[in-house]
Amino acid sequence: MKKEVCSVAFFKAVFAEFLATLIFVFFGLGSALKWPSALPTILQISIAFGLAIGTLAQALGPVSGGHINPAITLALLIGNQISLLRAIFYVAAQLVGAIAGAGILYWLAPGNARGNLAVNALSNNTTPGKAVVVELILTFQLALCIFSSTDSRRTSPVGSPALSIGLSVTLGHLVGIYFTGCSMNPARSFGPAVVMNRFSPSHWVFWVGPIVGAVLAAILYFYLLFPSSLSLHDRVAVVKGTYEPEEDWEDHREERKKTIELTAH
């Protein structure tokens, strides 16, 4: 775990999650600003969120994995894909990035267009219980899309993961906006709520629904549909951040050999 944290690549990845979430929140919320001359449409907002996540997944995905979502990060932790420490740093970076993105938009947008900065809220007589189910389903399909389209074990052509993920986010918004404003991402809900200081009694919905949905998708995908062949020892090593793939072990064999020889002398 110490080795992982001390690497430059680790902190590049954490910064990439911060930057990606900042940009995602800025563009997503920006598409929902209520300009007096032209109110946003459901289609406009849905496409904007989808384009934003697709663009960022393509641009910064190679650096950090392009989670940009605490629910996805926690699901990948449960799915034994990342270490506990990486998950903690990623979630912290995502939340700070969301606050920064919402804050920048608040500062730039005029008061007559700002509105409530697209803070998520229940609408159309949606109860908290129903809202949780809606967010669970929306995030479940998003998480499955992410896991499947980015699975390195797949040998068949998968197309563009960034495009698939962007379309999945767009799909979720086309349905979810009518119920909850569509979150699918606790950071997206948390950022504007902090900036506007508007935490409704139902704010928990935008944490519980997405996290449960993503975790259920991870359990289904990584343990039932496409289980990993890693041993229990290797699974523990992944969570601790000490797991080294066989390819890396071969690459570093000579380095280890020299170290052993020096120690022997």
UniProtKB/Swiss-Prot annotation:
Q: Name one GO biological process term.
A: saliva secretion
Q: Which residues lie within the membrane without crossing it?
A: 66-74, 181-191
Which GO MF term does the entry hold, naming one? water channel activity
> What are the entry keywords?
Cell membrane, Cytoplasmic vesicle, Glycoprotein, Membrane, Repeat, Transmembrane, Transmembrane helix, Transport
Q: How does it sit in the membrane?
A: Multi-pass membrane protein
* Knockout mutant characteristics: Homozygous mice are born at less than the expected Mendelian rate, indicative of embryonic lethality. After weaning, mice display decreased pilocarbine-induced saliva secretion, and their saliva displays increased osmolality and viscosity. Mice display reduced Ca2+ entry and loss of regulatory volume decrease in response to hypotonicity in acinar cells. HTS-stimulated Ca2+ entry is significantly decreased in submandibular gland acini and almost completely abolished in parotid acini. Lung airspace-capillary osmotic water permeability is strongly decreased.
Cellular compartment(s): Apical cell membrane; Cell membrane; Cytoplasmic vesicle membrane
Query: Which sites does the entry annotate for glycosylation?
Result: 124
Which Gene Ontology terms of cellular component type are present?
apical plasma membrane; basal plasma membrane; cytoplasmic vesicle membrane; endoplasmic reticulum; microvillus; plasma membrane
* Motif NPA 2: positions: 185-187
Membrane spanning stretches: 13-33, 40-60, 88-108, 127-147, 159-179, 204-224
One Pfam family name from the record? Answer: MIP
Topology Extracellular: residue spans: 34-39, 109-126, 180, 192-203
Give the residue interval(s) assigned to the motif NPA 1. Answer: 69-71
Cytoplasmic compartment residues: 1-12, 61-65, 75-87, 148-158, 225-265
| Record's keyword annotation contains Transmembrane | yes
What does the record say about tissue specificity?
Detected at the luminal membrane of secretory epithelial cells in hindpaw sweat glands. Detected in acinar cells in salivary glands, in duct cells in lacrimal glands and in lung (at protein level). Detected in lung, parotid, submandibular, sublingual, and lacrimal gland tissues.
What this chain does, per the record?
Aquaporins form homotetrameric transmembrane channels, with each monomer independently mediating water transport across the plasma membrane along its osmotic gradient. Plays an important role in fluid secretion in salivary glands. Required for TRPV4 activation by hypotonicity. Together with TRPV4, controls regulatory volume decrease in salivary epithelial cells. Seems to play a redundant role in water transport in the eye, lung and in sweat glands.
The family database entries (NCBIfam families) matched by this protein are listed as: MIP (TIGR00861)
Assembly and partners are described as: Homotetramer; each monomer provides an independent water pore. Interacts with TRPV4; the interaction is probably indirect and regulates TRPV4 activation by hypotonicity.
Name the record gives this protein? Aquaporin-5
